Regions:
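Perimembrane helix-loop-helix junctions
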Residues: 4, 154-166, 170, 190-224, ...
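Loop-to-helix entry region of an early transmembrane alpha helix in multi-pass inner-membrane enzymes
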Residues: 70, 74, 82-100, 138
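Short acidic/glycine- and proline-prone juxtamembrane loop motifs at membrane-interface regions
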Residues: 136-144
Length: 421
């Protein structure tokens, strides 16, 4: 694991980054109404929980609503019990999870590539339009992305420690707890996705011995203690819960077109290409990390882990018969770390530097075009026929501004200087 020469930022730099992050994720959260259908739905369900005093059975307009587990509803109910505008309160936890995901990218990048990669990964993720924009929306998927990211980051940090080293056991338990919270957020994928990613990593990195270090009994007990009680209570109070929740909402939604959310197999590739602008232009350069490391790839397990994470998420959701844009959010953090590694590699490898320059220039151009188009829509110069779009712009534009700022910082060398602090 790379050891940094210095792992501190100046107080001025920390303050500037903190202010920028707060503005990006929390600025103007209440300046636009809740968007239908999702934001309104995920505000009404917790409101009804508070009104009825029933936190086991979710209801929407009085009708049972078991499409999702209740953790995000509970969090929103807690937020709505505070004084303030409902628009702000309902988006508060999503913004916190989005910012928390940036922190996880920093931890993961720092562990794999050092402090410069960690800081760059955090900047890449935080300034990616899709991540920043959906952090400002009242949707469940950002919470899921955070908990899945926390589970996988805890796994990585735990396996990087020596057996018995201080903090190792806490990280293993953190992995189980985060997977349980992900399960309470959006169902079985909360543990299936981390389990699949970890299995693939152990397979390709040939690190099966890690399994002997996992506290399976205590970890499983912790997972069950967090994830199971609500499922038991919901089944006891609602006879049709088990079939609807496990069969209809998990199996049938994934394997059939019943939800009427079909899209082409390449749908999420396109979403990532646009949603990570300008950094999606840098990702092809990340492929050179694997080509250059062919002979020593087993000595760079971080690359294997990031590839297993990103590719499995992409393939898993691409195979689903139900596709929506936010589903791919959990696959963005490893791509941010890969982009940061590519940017670092570009400083020493001329060919990687050429790839980064060309891809970055294309990404910056596309970002500028996208920002200009959205601005014209907001000003009424372009008519889309989609009435909510001007409201979407309110939280999309800060993300685009962050992306443009990051491009300017990188192009001028200021981002590299910042990451070196």
């Amino acid at each position: 694991m790379p050891q940094p020469a210095s792992d501190t930022l100046s107080p001025r730099t920390r303050l500037a980054l903190g202010v920028l992050a707060l503005l990006l994720f929390f600025g103007g959260l209440g300046s636009y109404p809740l968007l239908e259908p999702d934001e309104g739905r995920y505000a009404e369900i917790p409101r009804e929980m508070l009104a009825r005093g029933d936190f086991v059975t979710p209801r929407l307009n009085g009708v049972l609503y078991f499409e999702k587990p209740p953790l995000y509803y509970w969090l929103n109910a807690a937020a709505l019990s505070l004084p303030g505008r409902p628009e702000v309160l309902c988006r508060l936890f999503s913004a916190l999870f989005g910012l928390g995901g940036v922190g996880l990218a920093w931890l993961l990048g720092r562990s794999i590539g050092g402090p410069r990669v960690g800081l760059t990964a955090a900047i890449v993720l935080g300034s990616s339009p899709l991540w920043a924009a959906l952090s400002r929306a009242n949707i469940i998927d950002m919470a899921l992305a955070f908990f899945l990211g926390a589970a996988l980051t805890c796994f990585w940090l735990a396996q990087e420690k020596e057996r018995g080293e201080r903090g190792e056991r806490l990280l293993w338990y953190g992995m189980f707890a985060a997977a349980a919270l992900a399960t309470l957020t959006k169902g079985l994928i909360g543990f299936l996705i981390p389990g699949a990613v970890i299995f693939l990593y152990l397979l390709f990195a040939r690190r099966w011995r890690l399994l002997s270090r996992v506290p399976w009994i205590g970890g499983t007990a912790l997972f069950l203690a967090i994830a199971v009680p609500w499922h038991v209570l919901a089944a006891q109070r609602n006879p049709d819960f088990l079939w609807f929740y496990f069969v209809h909402e998990h199996w049938l939604r994934y394997t059939t077109s019943e939800a009427k959310r079909q899209a082409p197999a390449w749908f999420f590739v396109g979403i990532l290409a646009v949603g990570l602008i300008p950094w999606s232009g840098v990702l092809p350069a990340a492929a050179r990390l694997y080509r250059r490391g062919q002979g020593r790839l087993r000595d760079r397990p971080g690359l294997i882990f990031l590839a297993c994470w990103a590719l499995f998420l992409l393939l898993f959701f691409s195979a689903s018969q139900s596709k929506l844009v936010p589903y791919i959010l959990p696959g963005i953090p490893p791509l941010a770390v890969l982009a940061a590694l590519a940017l670092q590699e570009a400083e020493t490898d001329p060919r990687t530097r050429s790839w980064v320059r060309v891809g970055g220039a294309i990404g910056a151009l596309l970002l500028a075009i996208l920002a200009a188009a959205l601005l014209l829509v907001a000003l009424g110069k372009i008519h889309t026929g989609v009435s909510p779009l001007p409201n979407v712009l309110v939280f999309a534009m800060p993300a685009l501004a962050a992306g443009l700022l990051s491009v300017w910082l990188w192009g001028s060398g200021r981002l590299r200087s910042l990451a070196a602090l």
